[in-house]
Amino acid sequence: MTGRLDEDLKDVTLLGNQNTKYLFEYSPEILEVFDNNHPNRDYFVKFNCPEFTSLCPKTGQPDFATIYISYIPEQKMVESKSLKLYLFSFRNHGDFHEDCMNVIMNDLIKLMDPRYIEVWGKFTPRGGISIDPYCNYGRPGTKYEQMADYRMMNHDLYPETIDNR
């Protein structure tokens, strides 16, 4: 099968919509999915999101990050414009870096039920320290659970320089 029919995309309402509303408060309900046309194949989908912002829950100061989201889909896939708007909704959300990454991962698991997913935030330094939280998930009782354990054990083994933001 090649291409998609309009009926296949009936739940995709934000893509191509010229009346997009940008939400400034955390809004997981904005996320949309579409069907994976290749559910019998393992493959990664990776999003590079270089303009993520949130607020420090204590000081209210802005935090900036590039977020990397990689997943192996099952039946559903997240639509990219809805993901962009969802990430934008963190703009005025006060939470620690680690919490933001886990919230994003949990929302995407709830939305798509992927075989595997990982979310990595590379935050710009504030106060001379950068924080790069990484979280992952593999579907329990499957090879993806073992994959998650392996990737967690081997994650970020090599030191890096701060100029890779």
Curated annotation (Swiss-Prot):
> Where does this one sit in the cell?
Cytoplasm
What pathway annotation does it carry? Answer: tRNA modification; tRNA-queuosine biosynthesis
The GO terms describing molecular function are: preQ1 synthase activity
State the superkingdom: Bacteria
Q: Which UniProt keywords apply?
A: Cytoplasm, NADP, Oxidoreductase, Queuosine biosynthesis
**Transmembrane feature ranges:** none
Alphabetical list of InterPro entries matching this protein? GTP-CH-I_C/QueF, NADPH_dep_7-cyano-7-deazaG_red, QueF, QueF_type1
Gene Ontology process terms (BP): queuosine biosynthetic process; tRNA modification
**Residues at the active site:** C56, D63
State the EC number(s). 1.7.1.13
Q: What's the catalysed reaction? A: 7-aminomethyl-7-carbaguanine + 2 NADP(+) = 7-cyano-7-deazaguanine + 2 NADPH + 3 H(+)
Class of enzymatic activity (EC top level) = oxidoreductase
Residues binding substrate: V78, E79, S80, H97, E98
Gene Ontology annotations for the cellular component aspect, listed alphabetically: cytosol
Query: NCBIfam families per the record?
Result: QueF-II (TIGR03139)
Question: What is this protein's name?
Answer: NADPH-dependent 7-cyano-7-deazaguanine reductase
